[in-house]
């Protein structure tokens, strides 16, 4: 997900996106723990997307 796409979203949409990403991260962690995760790069992508969303929420809160 690109930062520019996220910047166009409202705070409510960003909070929803963050919740979805956290759920996805949990599911990926469970798959990795049980040995079912084939695409290990997805956990890194999700972690970075979470950081992007949190950064934008902080920016919007300060503005």
Curated annotation (Swiss-Prot):
Keywords from the UniProt entry: Ribonucleoprotein, Ribosomal protein
Entry GO terms, CC: cytosolic large ribosomal subunit
GO aspect biological process, one term: translation
Signal peptide: none
Pfam families (UniProt xref): Ribosomal_L29 (PF00831)
Ribonucleoprotein listed as a keyword: yes
Gene3D superfamilies according to UniProt: 1.10.287.310
Membrane-crossing segments per the record: none
GO molecular function: structural constituent of ribosome
Protein family (similarity comment): Belongs to the universal ribosomal protein uL29 family.
Protein name: Large ribosomal subunit protein uL29
Organism: Yersinia enterocolitica serotype O:8 / biotype 1B (strain NCTC 13174 / 8081)
Taxonomic path: Bacteria, Pseudomonadati, Pseudomonadota, Gammaproteobacteria, Enterobacterales
Gene: rpmC
């Amino acid at each position: 997900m690109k930062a520019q796409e996220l910047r166009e979203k409202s705070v409510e949409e960003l909070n929803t996106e963050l919740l979805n990403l956290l759920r996805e991260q949990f599911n990926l962690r469970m798959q990795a723990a049980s040995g079912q995760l084939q695409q290990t790069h997805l956990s890194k992508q999700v972690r970075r997307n979470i950081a992007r969303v949190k950064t934008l929420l902080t920016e919007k809160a300060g503005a």
